[in-house]
Design a protein with these regions (language model features):
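Extended, hydrophobic alpha-helical segments
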Residues: 1-34, 38, 42, 46-47
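Intrinsically disordered, low-complexity boundary segments flanking structured domains
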Residues: 25-28, 52-57, 80-83
Length: 96
């Protein structure tokens, strides 16, 4: 399933920068960054549960927020890209 994840981490207080880096790293382990605080992830239900648990453990729920947008398996018809940065083919081959 295709999931769009966005986050807002308060960085003005102590520990904020660290939480921000950790949230970004967790997201990067599961998907592709498309904007500063937005990631596209293609995951199965088990991976999604693990991803959510990891992210929730990294944030301070009194100061930070996470949003999960579930676009399902037919996501290609729901996503439109306009402008700079060519879109990344989530299901294509990955060369490291």
């Amino acid at each position: 399933m295709f999931v769009l994840i966005s986050y807002d981490v308060a960085t003005t207080e102590e520990g904020g920068q660290r939480r921000l880096r950790r949230v970004a790293k967790v997201c990067k382990d599961y998907g592709q960054r498309v904007q500063y605080s937005v990631f596209e992830c293609i995951v199965d239900p088990a991976q999604l549960a693990k991803l959510k648990d990891k992210l929730i453990s990294e944030i301070d729920p009194k100061k930070d927020s996470l949003r999960f947008y579930y676009l399902g398996s037919n996501w290609q018809h729901r996503v439109e890209h306009v402008g700079a940065k060519e879109p990344f083919d989530q299901e294509g081959p990955l060369i490291v």
